Amino acid sequence: MKSVDAASLPAFLERRPLVVDVRSPVLFRQGSLEGALNIPTADIQQKKHQLPKDRPILLVCERGIQSELAGLYLEADGYAEVYNLAGGLNALKR
């Protein structure tokens, strides 16, 4: 899995990745990246999603830990272009 840091995020978003926020719906409603989908980590683990395998996927959470775990599940399921926002959404607030 590859990482994207806060400084390179704007350029990475120009590639039009599918942005997936893996936090709970309650936290997601408090704010996320524009255009993000909310698919909690447990749903990714249990394959309760229909994420495309032919598009880059950027996973985000609060600190980058939960999204990294979700990325490992996706990679184990055959997803090749999985990216994690290093430091999570908190890194964007610094």
List where the protein language model places each region:
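Rhodanese-like catalytic fold shared by cysteine-dependent sulfurtransferases
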Residues: 1-18, 24-56, 63-94
